[in-house]
Amino acid sequence: MTAGDPMRLHPGHALSSFTEHLRALAPELLGPNRFAALDGATGSSGGTGAKDIAPHGTTIVAVSYRGGVLIAGDRRATQGNLLASRDMDKVYITDTFSAAGIAGTAGMAVELVRLFAVELEHYEKIEGVPLTFDGKANKLSKMVRDNLPAALQGLAVVPVLVGYDERAGDPDRAGRIVSYDVVGGRSEERFGYTAVGSGSMFAKTSLKKLYAKGIDQARALRIALESLYDASDDDTATGGPDLLRGIYPTAVVIDAEGALEVPESRLEEIARGIVADRTAAQEGSAGA
């Protein structure tokens, strides 16, 4: 890398951050900078109209299990009182040992998590080593904080980061979950699960009843999808399994072997099992 290389911010300092590199060369391409005049465009002084001009996505759940962690999300996106999308993907693999789920303004959230994935790849190429899980969590925290101007205008992004910590002493506790608030504050979940989005209250209530430490991957995936089903039952912005159209939640599992998207066939089998169990329980109570 030469002294005149654009990858250097100043002599002796290489830009291992892709975001900072972009900010130095083309700041107008960064998400928050493109929404500086949103209030004037929407005629809103406080961003109240922003929720109606852009699709919003919810709900995301994350569950740790023995030897790993998973993250799952529903597929619905809403725009005001309209259903903007039935099959939006809200869960993304960001590198070999991490994944992120997004809630909030759909377009900005997808852009943020994709930029985050580029950040991780760029850092590894420049530095020769991948970021630690704590480094990834801090990096995402800063990116959420950088979105604050847009968030104050109603275009908030709230991600959840999960990953397998290769440096963990106990492999059974290597699965980690970090949630964020709208200003970038990070909070690591120590109790094995979390949920974000408009249906998070209902999903967390479900997880609280179903979760137990030391569960295996199969059980964790079942309760994650069951919590999304419970959220969709009470939150109109959360989509449940659509058996007619073949639309089911998406999920990523991460263990010592790396991150892997759960096959749709497996998710369909679990979702149909949940619906069948709930139907049987409902018919049983009706006949009692």
UniProtKB/Swiss-Prot annotation:
Keyword Protease appears in the UniProt entry: yes
PROSITE patterns named among the record's database cross-references: PROTEASOME_BETA_2
Propeptide residues, chain positions: 1-57
Record InterPro entries: Ntn_hydrolases_N (IPR029055), Proteasome_sua/b (IPR001353), Proteasome_suB-type (IPR023333), PSB_actinobac (IPR022483)
Reaction catalyzed: Cleavage of peptide bonds with very broad specificity
Entry annotated with the keyword Iron-sulfur: no
GO cellular component, one term: cytoplasm
Coiled coil location: none
Cell compartments where the protein resides: Cytoplasm
Record EC number: 3.4.25.1
Pathway(s) it belongs to: Protein degradation; proteasomal Pup-dependent pathway
NCBIfam families assigned: 20S_bact_beta (TIGR03690)
Function as written in the Swiss-Prot or TrEMBL entry: Component of the proteasome core, a large protease complex with broad specificity involved in protein degradation.
Sequence similarity: Belongs to the peptidase T1B family.
The name this protein goes by in its record: Proteasome subunit beta
Organism: Nocardia farcinica (strain IFM 10152)
Name of encoding gene: prcB
